[in-house]
Amino acid sequence: AAVSSSQKDDSEAEDSSIDIGGGKYGIHIRHLIQLMAFYGIITYIVVVVIFNLPFLMEKHHFSSGNSGLMISLFFLAITAPGFCLNKIVGLLKERTKAYSLLSIALGLLLIWIAPLEWLIIPGCLLVGLGYGVIQPMLYEKTTHAALPQKATMALAFVMMMNYLAILLYPFIGDFLQWVFHTQSQEFPFIFNLLITVGTFFWAYRCRDTFLFNDQLK
């Protein structure tokens, strides 16, 4: 009985430490929307590597095997930060997402500026590393926007944005190329680079807010 009472007290203390903004659903709606929007944006930014890099490399007369290798390195880089995420966040703290976006921006720039493997390889790695840091941070942050019994629902909404961004990317890309009257294979990288730079300034300016202030223990 004493153990049960102690567990109940711990659970109540955990619930009281989570800010749900007075939401009646046990979820801080504004924070959840911010997380969803940010995750959708960064996923849209990085999937340019999957969708458009093969066409860009084909234009520069690389083989399909070369583009496949680059995409494999991109996914490998996404997984790498998970092995030392706490150290990364402990070092960068509220600037974690801003510097991760800077990594993505630099990666896109390297892919865009020259058709050389020795630039495209680090470009793919930098994009993957930046995304690999941000993704688990968003999942962790989501648990602080909902009560424990609502955390799974909140995570489902956030994770939905990943698939939604992938689903909509080809349609948005085609629409933007139609709007700007271009069929350039570099255009998606330039456009996503601009989005990344804008998002970087947003993250840096708002580094002390709920969405961007990351301090894992």
Task: Report residues per predicted region.
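A membrane-interface helix-boundary motif in multi-pass transporters
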Residues: 173-195
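Helix-to-loop junctions at the C-terminal end of transmembrane segments
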Residues: 80-94, 177-178
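Intracellular juxtamembrane helix-capping segments at the cytosolic ends
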Residues: 133-146
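Extracytoplasmic gate region of multi-pass secondary transporters
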Residues: 31-72, 78
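Juxtamembrane intracellular "pre-TM" segments in multi-pass secondary transporters
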Residues: 4-38, 217
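C-terminal membrane-cytosol helix-exit motif in multi-pass small-molecule transporters
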Residues: 1-13, 199-207
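A late C-terminal transmembrane helix in Major Facilitator Superfamily
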Residues: 145-181
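Structural signature of the two symmetry-related core transmembrane helices
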Residues: 95-110
